[in-house]
Amino acid sequence: MRTLTIEPLTKEAFAPFGDVIETDGSDHFMINNGSTMRFHKLATVETATPEDNAIISIFRADAQDMPLTVSMLERHPLGSQAFIPLLGNPFLIVVAPLGDVPVSGLVRAFVTNGRQGINYHRGVWHHPVLTIEKRDDFLVVDRSGKGNNCDEHFFKEDERLILAPHQ
């Protein structure tokens, strides 16, 4: 099994998979009589049809035992999915490029700085949320509507990956 190298999350490195939601290096303008900086359109919510709705939820995630065997990835073919950390803790991201099935050899892992969120583009393969802390909360923006919006792919045993603890 291949051990994934955990990369720091940057906009450039994550661009094939989605958007990094952060203020650092992002354009902004002043609103509210000059008392507020607006970092505008850091990500776009994608939905498949005009009947779909963008919704906001909170996910409360428990940490996984490390090292973690990455045996599956999921994707949301009908909409994007954003995770914004509410408690300021770094979290791990495991992704693979668009495709009918994820390719084990193309899987990448990232770690946020605790102030970054991410928005997976429609159809991007990813692991379910991976918190580093014992328990963590995330604001999630995704799609509600008709149709199955979650495909899962389980890797064959020889395709599985290892995610080691973040140092």
Curated annotation (Swiss-Prot):
Pathway, per record: Nitrogen metabolism; (S)-allantoin degradation
Top-level EC class: lyase
Cofactors that this protein relies on: Ni(2+)
Gene3D superfamilies assigned to the protein according to its UniProt record, in alphabetical order: Ureidoglycolate hydrolase
Catalytically driven reaction(s): (S)-ureidoglycolate = urea + glyoxylate
Matching InterPro entries: RmlC_Cupin_sf, UAH_cupin, Ureidogly_lyase, Ureidogly_lyase_bac, Ureidoglycolate_lyase_dom_sf
GO biological process, one term: purine nucleobase catabolic process
GO MF annotations in UniProt: ureidoglycolate hydrolase activity; ureidoglycolate lyase activity
Swiss-Prot/TrEMBL keywords: Lyase, Purine metabolism
Enzyme Commission number(s) from the entry: 4.3.2.3
Pfam family, one: Ureidogly_lyase
Family classification: Belongs to the ureidoglycolate lyase family.
Complex formation: Homodimer.
PANTHER family in the record: UREIDOGLYCOLATE HYDROLASE, UREIDOGLYCOLATE LYASE
Function (record text): Catalyzes the catabolism of the allantoin degradation intermediate (S)-ureidoglycolate, generating urea and glyoxylate. Involved in the utilization of allantoin as nitrogen source.
HAMAP family, alphabetized: Ureidogly_lyase
Name of the protein described by the UniProt record: Ureidoglycolate lyase
Organism: Pseudomonas fluorescens (strain Pf0-1)
Recorded name of the encoding gene: allA
